[in-house]
């Protein structure tokens, strides 16, 4: 798909400019299939700078090659623009509100700010790093009473800062820290009657046996991540973080993704299916290599954990005993189990009995929905953590 004329000419800024020009030239009432709108687009009006209409068209064909094409051209351009904008501004700090109070300087920074000019004159050839090292040492050598004065000034200004921040948040509630979700992540599970007498055991069981931890704990260090189970699972993972769906609630997002899946042409579904098959093959190879690196004890623990995965999920929901992940009986580790031919297939085979293989990963929509939810919540939590990391604490 890459043209020799376009290689090395397009910067990220140029690509964003191309997408903006395309947006301006797409009709506002665009609701047709993207191919029809793309065919009617006047590329001579899209052209800008050194890039002709034909070059712009060719570059757009390269960009849209990996995009899902069952939507309108407007939606495709918006998704491409969002992905490039996110990539360009990934490491930029969000601009703070102009009225937001400034956090006071710490005791050391106050000392540093006061003394830096003096030491710059004393050591004109020193770099900033060298000056900082000297001033840090000088601050450590300060008498306790002088250091206390800097600390008291900081505490006083910090109290004023906290008062101003409370007033600021009342005036600008959106600018403060994001509110925590009131939706519980998981329902509390029942605790066995036998453990009611031991309060510590009760608390640990509630924490370790929640539905969320059952699925997340079944993962050994270095174990390859499982690929999508089928074409719809792959489509769902890609669609979940799509910019035009982010404003929807989880439930509505599920419904919308399902609706869109029914509109996907058969050739697109076949494309997703082929991708999944390729990922499954890669996963089997990686898993096979990873299993061969395990010690006999680690392999025995892994096989036992995967064999009892389905049982453990059922027991956790009904309040049964849940053993710690990764533990195995001494007798199992002493056996020194080695990987035999076909063992990887046995561990991955969804059709075998649950007592000897992994159960619950492939059977039924409920398992599929649980996997979707885990992947989706990881995407949303990562986005949330990125945005909340720029806020300052009170």
From Swiss-Prot:
Entry's localization field: Cytoplasm; Nucleus
Keywords: Cytoplasm, Developmental protein, DNA-binding, Nucleus, Repeat
Location of region: Disordered: 167-197, 305-394
InterPro entries, per database record: HMG_box_dom (IPR009071), HMG_box_dom_sf (IPR036910), UBF1 (IPR051762)
Keyword ATP-binding: no
A Pfam entry, by short name: HMG_box
Residue ranges, compositional bias (Polar residues): 183-197
Keyword Repeat included in the entry's annotation: yes
Any one annotated GO CC term: nucleus
GO process terms (BP): blastocyst growth; embryo implantation; regulation of gene expression
GO MF annotation list: DNA binding
CDD domains (UniProt xref): HMG-box_UBF1_rpt1-like, HMG-box_UBF1_rpt6-like
Coiled-coil spans in chain: none
UniProt feature, compositional bias: Basic residues: 167-180
Ranges annotated as DNA-binding: 101-169, 225-291
Function: Essential for proliferation of the inner cell mass and trophectodermal cells in peri-implantation development.
Designated name of the protein: Upstream-binding factor 1-like protein 1
The organism of origin for this protein: Mus musculus
């Amino acid at each position: 798909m890459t043209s020799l004329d376009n290689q090395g000419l397009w910067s990220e800024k140029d690509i964003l400019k191309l997408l903006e020009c395309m947006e301006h030239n797409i009709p506002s009432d665009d609701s047709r299939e993207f191919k029809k709108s793309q065919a009617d687009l006047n590329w001579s009006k899209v052209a800008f700078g050194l890039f002709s209409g034909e070059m712009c068209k060719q570059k757009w064909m390269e960009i849209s090659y990996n995009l899902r094409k069952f939507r309108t051209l407007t939606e495709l351009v918006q998704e491409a623009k969002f992905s490039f904008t996110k990539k360009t501004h990934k490491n930029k700090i969000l601009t703070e509100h102009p009225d937001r109070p400034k956090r006071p300087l710490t005791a050391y920074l106050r000392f540093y700010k006061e003394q830096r000019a003096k030491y710059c004159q004393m050591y004109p050839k020193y770099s900033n790093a060298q000056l900082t090292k000297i001033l840090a040492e000088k601050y450590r050598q300060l008498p306790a009473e002088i250091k206390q004065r800097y600390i008291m000034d900081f505490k006083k200004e910090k109290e004023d800062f906290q008062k101003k921040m409370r007033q600021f948040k009342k005036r600008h509630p959106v600018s403060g820290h994001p509110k925590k979700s009131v939706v519980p992540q998981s329902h509390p599970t029942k605790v066995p009657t036998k453990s009611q007498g031991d309060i510590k055991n009760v608390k640990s069981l509630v924490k370790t046996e929640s539905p969320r931890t059952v699925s997340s704990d079944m993962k050994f260090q270095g174990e390859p991540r499982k690929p999508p189970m089928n074409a719809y699972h792959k489509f769902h993972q890609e669609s979940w973080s799509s910019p035009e769906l982010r404003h929807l609630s989880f439930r509505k997002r599920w419904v919308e993704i399902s609706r869109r899946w029914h509109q996907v042409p058969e050739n697109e579904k076949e494309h997703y299916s082929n991708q999944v098959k390729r990922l499954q093959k890669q996963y089997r190879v990686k898993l096979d290599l990873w299993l061969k690196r395990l010690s006999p004890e680690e392999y025995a623990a892994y096989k036992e954990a995967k064999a009892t995965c389905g049982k453990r999920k059922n027991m956790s929901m009904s309040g049964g005993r849940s053993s710690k992940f990764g533990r195995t009986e001494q007798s199992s580790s002493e056996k020194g189990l080695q990987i035999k031919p076909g063992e990887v297939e046995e561990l991955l085979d969804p059709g075998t009995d649950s007592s000897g293989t992994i159960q619950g990963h492939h059977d039924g929509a409920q398992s599929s929905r649980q996997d979707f939810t885990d992947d989706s919540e990881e995407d949303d939590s990562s986005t949330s953590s990125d945005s909340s990391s720029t806020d300052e604490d009170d």
